[in-house]
UniProtKB/Swiss-Prot annotation:
Mg(2+) 1 binds at residues 284, 297. Pathway: Cell wall biogenesis; peptidoglycan biosynthesis. This is D-alanine--D-alanine ligase. GO terms for molecular function: ATP binding; D-alanine-D-alanine ligase activity; metal ion binding. The gene is ddl. Belongs to the D-alanine--D-alanine ligase family. InterPro entries: ATP-grasp, ATP_grasp_subdomain_1, D-Ala_lig_Van_CS, D_ala_D_ala, Dala_Dala_lig_C, Dala_Dala_lig_N, PreATP-grasp_dom_sf. Cell wall formation.
């Protein structure tokens, strides 16, 4: 069998561009263990330009090939692509639509599932439709006096709130608000990141994560892992990725009753199947002191940085990441 020409596409136009590059390192290292693929790593910059790791300017054409600006270099045909892009245009579903248009097989969730999960408002509507408990919320579609009044009413009712840009990841455009005098400014900032904003009740709870992925025809949900932050903070962008972060992670959360763990995993699989996710996801939950389970969010292309939970949970579940990737890629190309 001839080797598969695999395009590892990373970067993108969001605030998570640099995190995407770190995740791509993990994919590149894992793929290097396989003798079945030729890997070409290409960075998509914030202006939509492509460049190889060697610094060659290039583009992905509608003929499913990488064409170089230096015309002395032969085009590189692409059999398969891994869009290792956090945020826009990867997790938003935009780039998947393009792959569908040019009939290029790709790793990860399809366009509609990606879009539905990335938009926090759409996602919560899906959670409720599937009968999966989630945090109380309101959503806003413009910054005006009415939006400020609605948010202040929510704060008065709930005591503490999170104001979030509806279409951002990694806690970008996310603010915890306890003081009504801060509402107007925070709303203005959030609307600077997205055209829609969601306001959620602050939940005092443990933050649990489940890796959910397809393996040999089955949907697998790992035991919940846990993000442990300082009690007075939340899991901000810096807490996730900065070297000075004080947050820590447990690949398997401690002191979670077996029946609660089973219910979390059941909800995770229900969300994965109900929202028609594909290949991989990380599904995040809150667990309150009263053992109430609330689905927080779904990440359709979870990070694979040195501190990321998804690859650790997959490995802890007994699966090798390189073998997992190979099974997905070969299965997808065989069904083409």
């Amino acid at each position: 069998m001839s080797k598969i020409n695999l395009l590892l596409l990373c970067g993108g136009g969001s605030a998570e561009h640099d995190i995407s590059l770190l995740s791509a390192n993990y994919f590149e290292t894992s793929l290097a263990k396989s003798e079945q693929v030729n890997v070409l790593r290409v960075v998509l910059d914030k202006f939509g330009q492509y460049q190889t790791a060697a610094g060659d300017d290039c583009e992905l054409t509608n003929n499913r090939e990488i064409r170089f600006r230096d015309e002395t270099k032969a085009p590189w045909p692409v059999d398969y692509v891994i869009p290792c892009i956090h945020g826009y245009p990867g997790e938003t579903g935009d780039i998947q639509s393009y792959f569908n248009l040019i009939q290029l097989p790709y790793f990860g969730c399809e366009s509609e599932a990606s879009s539905n999960c990335f938009n926090k408002i759409t996602a919560k509507m899906w959670f409720s439709a599937l009968g999966i408990p989630n945090t109380p919320y309101i959503f806003l579609n413009q910054y005006d006096d009415e939006a400020i009044a609605q948010t202040q009413a929510a704060l008065e009712n709930w005591g503490s709130i999170f104001v979030k840009a509806a279409s951002q990841g990694s806690s970008v455009g996310c603010y915890k608000v306890d003081d009504s005098s801060k509402v107007a400014g925070v709303l203005k900032d959030a609307f600077g990141y997205a055209p829609y904003v969601i306001v959620e009740k602050t939940i005092k709870a443990r933050e649990l994560e489940v890796a959910v992925y397809e393996y040999q025809g089955e949907v697998v949900a790992t035991l919940p892992g846990e993000i442990i932050c300082d009690s007075n903070t939340f899991y901000t962008f810096d807490e996730k990725y900065a070297k000075s972060s004080k947050a820590r992670t447990d690949v398997v959360a401690q002191n979670v009753p077996a029946d609660i763990s089973d219910q979390i995993r059941a909800y995770a699989i229900k969300a994965f199947k109900g929202m028609k996710l594909r290949h991989l996801s990380r599904i995040d939950f809150f667990l309150t002191q009263d053992n109430e389970i609330l689905l927080n969010e779904i990440n359709t292309f979870p990070g694979s940085t040195p501190i990321s939970m998804f690859p650790k949970m997959l490995q802890n579940h007994g699966h090798d990441f390189t073998e997992y990737l190979s099974l997905v890629i070969k299965g997808q190309l065989a069904a083409k």
